[in-house]
Amino acid sequence: QVFGALAKMAVRIAKEYHLSLSYVDMGGGYFGGRDDMPDYRDYFKEIGKELSAHFDPQKTILIAEPGVSLISRATTFETTVIDVKDIRGRKFVVTDGSRTNLNPLVTRHLYPHHMEYLSDPSVRNTEPSQWVCGATCMEYDKLFEINEGPALVPGDKVIYDTAGGY
């Protein structure tokens, strides 16, 4: 709805100032990569509907930067458990990846992922809580907590889905 409103504003400005534009640049910031959120097709359907009310698609080019909404689903990031530390009764699972590898600006708080276990997880002890962390030793490098899951061991894989966008 936001990008539709921006496109509608571009139409309003073009009409108000009698502009004949060769292009309209809608910029970036398009979310994507999750089934519960819109993807680039949803955004551009709405943008196109609003812009076509005034602009001729043969004469006015739509410029957009859909980056993340296109690439985030296309890439996974595989990490390996390199150590498990028990510190004051808490389990910290250290991986060879980091939060900075997944999101350099460290703005994400949700990291969709799945596990590949080195051996059958059904025969492992169940841990009440395990924090999966990066190898930076920085406090912000805690990625997520696993509650009541099979104990992770060195060699297990944590594979992050939709990791292509930052």
Whereabouts are the PLM-identified features?
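Charged (often Lys/Glu-rich) extended helix/loop segments that serve as interaction or gating elements
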Residues: 46, 57, 61-166
